[in-house]
C-alpha cells in the first residue's frame, strides 16, 4: 500500500455567497508555490465550486475534488463526514506529499461546525452585506471557529453597516480568537489568513 503523509486539513465554512470559494481561490494561488495543496469542495446537487476553482486556475484540476452531498451541507461536514473523509484520504494517497487540504463546506448557517475528525483548523467566512448584526448573532461559526473572516468590507457604505460596530461585536463574541476584515477582490485581509494557517498549522514559513 502506498504510504502518504497526513496533511493539515483546513475546513472553510460560511453562508452562501459570503466568499468561501473566493477565499479558497486566493489562498491556493498565494500558497501553491510554497506548499503542496489540494481542495475538496461541497455542493448539494452539483460540483459548481469545483468548476469555479478549476476554471480560475487555482490549482491543477486533479488537485480539486468536488463532493455532491445530496442533502444538508451541515451533515456532510459534521454528523456524517464520510464522503469528505474519503475524498481527503483519496487525495492524500494520490499525491503522497500533500501538506494542506482545504475542505470547503456547502453554504450553511451560523450553526455550522466541522467534525474534528475532518478538520484540524476551521475558518468561517461571513460578509458585511449580511448586515452589521451578524457577528453579535453568535452561533458556533462565529464563536468557535479558529479564524473568522468578515468579507466584502467595501460594501459597508451601501448596506448601512458600521465596521466599527462589527469589530466591537466580533471582539466581544470571540475574545482571544483571531479574525480579520477582508476585501478579497483587492486581496485585503488575505495575508492574515495565510499567516494564521502557517502558524497554527505549524507549516513553517516559506518565502
Curated annotation (Swiss-Prot):
Its main location: cytoplasm. Keywords: Chaperone, Cytoplasm, GTP-binding, Nickel insertion, Nucleotide-binding. GO terms for biological process: urea catabolic process. It is found in: Cytoplasm. GO terms for molecular function: GTP binding; GTPase activity; nickel cation binding. Pfam families: cobW. It comes from the Bacteria. One of its GO terms (cellular component) is cytoplasm. GTP binds at residues 14-21. The keyword Metal-binding does not apply. HAMAP family: UreG. Homodimer. UreD, UreF and UreG form a complex that acts as a GTP-hydrolysis-dependent molecular chaperone, activating the urease apoprotein by helping to assemble the nickel containing metallocenter of UreC. The UreE protein probably delivers the nickel. Belongs to the SIMIBI class G3E GTPase family. UreG subfamily. Facilitates the functional incorporation of the urease nickel metallocenter. This process requires GTP hydrolysis, probably effectuated by UreG. This is Urease accessory protein UreG.
